[in-house]
Amino acid sequence: MTSSTSASEPVEPLADPWARPAPKALWLGLALVVTVLGLAAAGVRGLAAHVENPRASQAVERITSGAPWLIVGNSVAQSVVDPDRLAERLQVSAVAQASVDGALGPHVAALLRHHPPASGATVVVLMPTHNLLAGRLPSETDRALLVELLRWPDAPLTTLALGGAVSPLDLWRRDRVRARAALLGWVTATPLRIGAALSGVQVRVDDTLSNLGAEAGPVAGPSGPLPGAPPGRAVVEAEERPPESSVLPLLVEAAERAEARLIVVVPFDRRRQDAPCRTTPEDEAGRWLVERGVAVVDMRGAPLAPDAFSREFHLHNTGRAQATDLLAEGLRAVGPGAYWSGACGR
C-alpha cells in the first residue's frame, strides 16, 4: 500500500541551470567585452582622430595666435630666445615661441604654408642653416611630424621632404601614434574619472595632481618653450639641399601669401665665435635670401660669453638673456632684404 502510494506521487524534474535568468553582472561583463572588441576592431580610430601630436598642435596654436612676432625653428630657437624678454626689447605686445623640438626646414615650411600667421606678423625663422636646407626627411619621426602638420595635399613640399605624395604608410604611422596616445590617455584618465564620483577619493586625487604640478613647475604659456624631448635630441641628419631647390622658395612664397615679414636668423655658433664682421652673407643661402628681399640676421661671432653654450648651437639657460638682447639688437636694425652681422658689434 505504501509503495503504491509513493509510486503515484509526481516527481519534480531537476532544475536546468541554463534556464535561469543570467545575472546582471554577466550581461554587463559581456557588454564590456563587446565594447572592447569593437574598439580594437576599429583600430581605435574614432578615439584617435581627435588626438594630435602635442608638439605639432601647440606649435600650430601659437603660430595662429595672432601674436605680432613669431619665433619658428627647433630646439636651438627654444634654447636661445626668451620670448617675454624679446617682446620687451622689441617693445611689442607679444612674441610667440612656435618652435618644435627636432624640426627641420620642411616642418617650418609646413607650419607657414598650412597654418599661416596673422597678416602683418613678423616671422623669425631661427635654426642652423643645415637644418633649414634639409631635403628628404631621414626618420619615421620626422615624417610623422610633417604629416601631422599638413592640412591639404602639398605636392611641392611632400615631394621635397617625402619623395612624393603622403603614402598610406605615413598615414598609418600617424594614426598609430594617435591611437597609442589616445589609448594611453584614456587608460591614465580612468582612475580620475572613477575618483570624481567619490568625494574622498577626489580630494586625494587633487592633492596628488597638485603635488605633481608643483614638482614639474608651471605649464608653459603662449610665450614659453614647447614641451618635448630635451634640447639637442640626436637626429639622423637630412641631406642638405641647394637654396633654390630647398624649402626656402616655399618659405618666401608662404610669407608673401600671408602678408607676413620674414626674417631668417643664423644662430650663435660656438665654433664661430671669432667670425669676422661682414657686410654681405658669407654663404649661398644667405645671399639667395637677401636677393629676394628677405632680411638675414647672422649671430655668428656676436659677443656672447663662451660659457653660455651647452652644445654647438644650444645655450644654457643662464645665457638666454644675453643672447636674447643681442638678437633683439639685430632684429631692430635689419631692414627688408638687408644683412646684419652680430660680429660687427664686438
Describe the function of each predicted region.
Residues 46-66:
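Alpha-helical transmembrane signal-anchor/signal-peptide segments
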Residues 23-45:
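Hydrophobic membrane-insertion alpha-helices, especially the h-region
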Residues 66-67, 92-94, 119-122, 257-263, ...:
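Loop/turn elements at helix/coil->beta-strand transitions in domains of secreted/extracellular proteins
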Residues 141-258, 345-346:
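Secreted/periplasmic serine-hydrolase-like ester/acetyl group-modifying domain
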Residues 311-346:
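Histidine-centered active-site loop/cap adjacent to the catalytic His
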Residues 1-24:
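N-terminal Lys/Arg-rich, disordered targeting/topogenic segments
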Residues 61, 243, 249-317:
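Extended hydrophobic/aromatic segments used for targeting, binding, or gating
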Residues 72, 76-164:
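Membrane-embedded segments
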